Amino acid sequence: MLAKRFEDILHKLGMAGLEHPLFYHAPVGIRFEIGGEEPIYLDRRAAKLKTNPAYVQGALDRAAAIYRALPAVPDLLRIDGYPDEEPAESLLTVIRQRMGLPVPDEQLPAIELDEDGDTHAQVQFYWDLSGITFQPEQLLQEIILGDIGGWSGFVSSVYLTGPGPFLYHLYDDRGLDVLGSSRELLLPLYHQFHGWILEYNLEQIDRVFTADQPQRRKFTIDGRRFSSMAGF
């Protein structure tokens, strides 16, 4: 069962279950900033806000670059829906139309407990990506648009996992969490995309990934953040 496989992956990531924000509930993870410097909307004074295509493309470029650099190609997709807001059949219709996905391999009703201790009906849809044609950039773009003119059902509800294991969670246009079963698994991502790590969490993430390594020296050029090993 894909649901059982997903649960096993969470345990291997050191998590008892899915609890948001995911980054703060996993021993090893990286939180990336996805939204760039471009304004989100073209004209905030307009009666109807219009999303800035340059902002969307910049966020998509970052999310897709990190996706392509994952330790392996994701082979399991989970999307959560909330039938209190829309019937499960309607949710699935919207998901399939927007993502170009087939009927899910598994569909599981569940109960979600939120941060306030309240319960909500949930339905979990699972796809085995190894057996279907999958367009990851279409998925990523729909998530990015979720809070800024798209369908909000994709916000904080889409999870991709793969061998390692790892979990890739683009939660909205602002950020992305990648969790791993070990520091070594995510070390290439840490080095390659260090300049995109969310500054608020940078010190914490640096401590995890440089625990047994020479101290990194941080510097800024033209507003962009860089780092190098001390002594070089």
Region annotations inferred by a language model:
Residues 158-232:
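Alpha-helical oligomerization segments
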Residues 1-150:
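Extended, low-hydrophobicity segments enriched in charged/polar residues
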